[in-house]
Amino acid sequence: MATEDREMMEGRGAGESCPTFPKMAPDDPMSEGKPRASLPQEADTPKPDSSYDYLEEMETCEDGGCPGPPKVLSSKAGPATTKGQAGDGLELAELPSVPATAAPGSPVRERDAEMELEKVRMEFELKRLKYLHEENERQRQHEEVMEQLQQQATPRLFSGGLQDLLLPQNQFAMFLYCFIFIHIIYVTKEMIFFLFSKHYLFCIAAILLCLIKTLWS
């Protein structure tokens, strides 16, 4: 039984050293079961990789400092290290391309904000001055037009004011004007007859003086 087990281990291990098993009697079932139970466990245990051994050695050297030249990395650990170095190189190459932005409370941002506020204030002042200038210009033009109209209307007021006043505006005004004119004529006639009847000598003397003055001139 031990011979068969040894041949199986030689076929599986491909040159690996097999543990020595004590000789047991074939009649003992318990002794035969123990090697069979322990054999699969030892056969299934994986052999540690050389890269794992190298990593342990590197950690030991970093902690305690081991003398001697560093060992060459194994082929299994090589691609991962190369990949990590390439990734670091890309990150370092990308860092300068990122634009530097100022912090929210930095003096650069405060100066930019002050410049923007000053620009807005100047634009507001320019618009306000422009509006005031336009308003003053419109007021000045309005005053000039009103002054011209007053100058044109003033001569007409004195020259044709009486004529416009005497012109009747409607039929009632015409009736009033006629009544006043007839009443004036009637009152004048009565006054003349009263003067001649009461002061005829005085009236004759006044008429003679007017005639002499007219003839003398």
From Swiss-Prot:
The chain crosses the membrane at residues 165-185, 192-212. Residues 1-87 are annotated as: Disordered. It comes from the Eukaryota. It is found in: Membrane. Its main location: membrane. Keywords: Coiled coil, Membrane, Transmembrane, Transmembrane helix. GO terms for cellular component: endoplasmic reticulum; membrane. PANTHER family: TRANSMEMBRANE PROTEIN 247 (PTHR36691:SF1). Residues 1-10 have a biased composition (Basic and acidic residues). It is a multi-pass membrane protein. It comes from Bos taurus. This is Transmembrane protein 247. Residues 109-154 form a coiled coil. Pfam families: TMEM247.
